[in-house]
């Protein structure tokens, strides 16, 4: 869950998955009822939110503001616009392992370096980035029992750009008690980092030496394309409960490597960092390399029930991919409605667990063959995560407000074989703790 430079890029672009999810949710509302008299169109409904995310030990923090606006443009025809701006700062892990001696790393630009104290976690503490994201969607009925949603999305960062389109279709059956939905999304994303894209598995070089970069220190660009497909069914079980099932398929092609991640090459007995290229004054660090294709399949189910005026929901998601990552997510909410004024209190618990990618390595041993694909990015490693939180909301004269606070904890498992020599004295997969706070205000309803 860590929010850092590549939080949106480690797998499927969120513009794709997020747009597809939004389109699908928009289509799962009530079916289009027949109109027999003219009705007044709904005014603009605007929902604005501010979110703060902060990791422990001075690591990454994120401050985000977003606005969601929806306007009925005709009978059951809605235009939805979103704008998000966020800024990230802090210390970002680069994939190297701790050492009993100070370590020096060349920054991604190739124009500067930084040093980590002996025994310290290899973090680049000058990381910062900003992101602006825009999206628009259009919902409209195509018959009495069906409707469609079409949308576009765009986001821009200093070194990364996303563009995407999405489409959704939903059809009601069984006296509107059953809804079948289909969705598709396509995105094209581009990396364009300062200093150029590193050559996969090349050694890190000293400041001003671009031999390890594919573009000689220029702003080389690499692209990836992502396609998402979704099919789902939502069933009303009785007046108090509904259930939903979704299957989604995601395919990514192109540059799926993180150009900012490296691996340490250490002595297989002492665990001490091997010397880097002659004259560089650095240890031996190799830039990671991931496969150029990835296919993910997800199975999702949600059960929601009204319990005497309160609402309980539980969902489960299983994801598997051809990188050999399998994940399980269980999400639970219980909304206590507190009478007049729309007041409610909603506790939230989330459990997450995943296995490691087949090419994940905590480090590499000097003298051993280097795999074709390898990464020390701990987001690709084996870990478990737990989130607990609470949300409060109430109506206002012109809308509604809500606030939530969540605590996140993540613990992982490094490769046991990597704890050799000096490395046995360090935690090669440190725990991660984070706090999430959000406030939102909705008006115009």
Map each language-model feature to its residues:
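Outer-envelope beta-barrel architecture signal
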Residues: 40-46, 75-83, 132, 144-148, ...
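Transmembrane beta-strands of outer-membrane beta-barrel pores
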Residues: 50-54, 85-89, 152-158, 171-173, ...
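Outer-membrane beta-barrel translocator/channel fold
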Residues: 82-134, 179-240, 250-253, 344-394, ...
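Cleavable N-terminal export/targeting peptides
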Residues: 1-42, 201-213, 445
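Outer-membrane beta-barrel translocator domains and adjoining extracellular loop/strand segments
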Residues: 59-63, 82, 92-98, 153-155, ...
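Transmembrane beta-strands of outer-membrane beta-barrel proteins
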Residues: 45-51, 82-84, 139, 149-153, ...
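Solvent-exposed loop/turn segments connecting transmembrane beta-strands
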Residues: 54-62, 126-130, 154-164, 291-294, ...
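Outer-membrane beta-barrel "beta-signal"
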Residues: 169, 431-445
